[in-house]
A protein has these predicted regions:
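Phosphate-binding/switch region of NTP-binding enzymes
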Residues: 9-13, 146-235
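Conserved P-loop
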Residues: 1-93, 101
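Generic domain-boundary/flexible-linker signal
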Residues: 48-50, 105, 157-158, 209
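Structured loop/turn residues at beta-strand edges in well-structured enzyme cores
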Residues: 89, 142, 193
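Residues immediately flanking
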Residues: 42, 98, 203
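C-terminal regions of RecA-like/P-loop NTPase motor modules
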Residues: 1-4, 207-269
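P-loop NTPase motor core
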Residues: 93-189
Length: 269
């Protein structure tokens, strides 16, 4: 498969970081699968229990003395990856963790040190940074798979004025999923456009312990972006439980094969 962009979204503990880092390290053996794999941690996104080597981690945290330095640092670092890729120095995989935390960080930083004295300053700043990040995190340019995360947001129904009947604060009518990646401002409706795949994760209980379920096809409650939905026929699964990134790619690779060939072969185990 050519390098592609994957967005994984869900609440905390749904398994986003586990799947993202499984592209870098085997979580059962701690074997390093991607020596040049990179886990970019934004703000408070981190998990030392996943045993990813420090050499494969890049962190961006707020310095209260220079609040905007962490934001500009993210952009400069990503630009550096772009320059390196142009010279043939390509990462094995990039795991950007994650968009919602960056969104929160932008607001936090702007509150500490506003850039302009008007009410729209934060939103212009937010749009500028988010646009830059989504444009630079291009798998075709960087030459590797890019995995990103976001937390889960819920459809806003708004508040209706009893006197006028007017509803304010609601999501527009084209938002027809109850759950989707959690963002603010312009990016709230645009994040999935910058990914080839967008999958929803949730944690479920079972008699054998917690299951981290990744939904692969749309069912109405949660937003899914699946570019091969027109080829998604049995025995392809509607979801994967406690899967690794490699297992996800196997299913997607199988979905990309001609339908007649798939029926003969079945899904790879």
């Amino acid at each position: 498969m050519t390098p592609q962009r994957y967005n994984l979204y869900g609440q905390g503990g749904s398994g986003k970081s586990y799947i993202g880092t499984s592209a870098i390290i085997d979580h059962e053996t701690d074997e390093l699968l991607a020596p040049k794999g990179l886990w970019i941690q934004i703000g408070q996104e981190r998990n030392p229990n996943l045993h990813v080597p420090e050499a494969n981690i890049k962190r961006f945290n707020v310095d209260v003395l220079q609040p905007h330095a962490c934001i500009t640092g993210v952009i400069d670092f990503l630009k550096g990856l772009q320059v390196a890729a142009a010279k043939g120095q390509v990462a094995d995989v990039i795991f950007f963790d994650g968009y919602t935390e960056l969104d929160i960080l932008i607001g936090y930083v702007h509150d500490m040190q506003p850039l302009e004295n008007d009410k729209w300053s934060e939103w212009r700043y937010r749009k500028t940074i988010m646009t830059a990040v989504t444009q630079i995190l291009d798998s075709a340019v960087l030459g590797c798979d890019i995995i990103t995360t976001a937390r889960v947001g819920q459809l806003k129904k708004g508040v209706t004025d009893r006197r006028t009947g007017e509803t304010t604060g609601a999501d527009p009518d084209f938002v027809n999923s109850r759950y989707f990646p959690q963002m603010d401002g312009w990016m709230r409706y645009n994040l999935p456009s910058y990914h080839d795949w967008c999958f929803y994760l949730e944690a479920e209980d079972s008699i054998n312990g917690a299951i981290h379920r990744m939904h692969l096809v749309q069912d109405g409650d949660f937003f899914i972006k699946n570019g091969l939905s027109h080829r998604w026929k049995k025995p392809l699964p509607n979801h994967l439980d406690s899967a690794t990134f490699q297992q996800l790619k196997q299913v997607i690779d199988h979905a990309g094969k001609p339908i007649i060939q798939k029926e003969k072969e079945g899904v790879s185990k």
